[in-house]
Amino acid sequence: MGDFDMVLKFWGPVEADYSAHGGMVLTRLFTENPETQQLFPKFVGIAQSELAGNAAVSAHGATVLKKLGELLKAKGNHAAILQPLANSHATKHKIPIKNFKLIAEVIGKVMAEKAGLDTAGQQALRNIMATIIADIDATYKELGFS
């Protein structure tokens, strides 16, 4: 089984409740890596203790996971999906590439805990995310952003 199919096998619970899983991902990202919260102007004033259950955090987390779902379902044929995301994250949001690596690890942890992603699935997700992040980084370099 390929990496994409292995991860998609566990995607159902995430897809069934993007808001809850997205909220968990961003809350964990911000609590484990507090500096990342500063990259989201609308979340800067939210206390760490108030992140979980915050509707705006959950909504943005849902957006992140929906996009990841599109990327997973594209099974590597993702240039048309990824290009606009990479452009906006470089030129508008100014998100350093290392932050994609941080959120990728958090997504893996949340999927393991909440969707049953096993060890092989976690490695498959790491492989997929490494490719996606490398493609984002290539766009960043083309744009002169690093």
From Swiss-Prot:
Q: Which SUPFAM superfamilies match?
A: Globin-like
Broadest EC class assigned to this enzyme: oxidoreductase
* UniProt cross-references to InterPro entries, sorted A to Z: Globin (IPR000971), Globin-like_sf (IPR009050), Myoglobin (IPR002335)
Q: Which GO terms describe its biological process?
A: removal of superoxide radicals
Q: Which residues are nitrite-binding? A: 60
Predominant location: cytoplasm
* Location in or out of the cell: Cytoplasm, Sarcoplasm
What keywords is this UniProt entry annotated with? Cytoplasm, Heme, Iron, Metal-binding, Muscle protein, Oxidoreductase, Oxygen transport, Transport
Identify the residues that bind O2: 60
Please give the subunit comment from the record.
Monomeric.
Family assignment? Belongs to the globin family.
Listed name of the protein = Myoglobin
- What species does this protein belong to? Tetraodon nigroviridis
Q: What is the lineage of its organism?
A: Eukaryota, Metazoa, Chordata, Craniata, Vertebrata
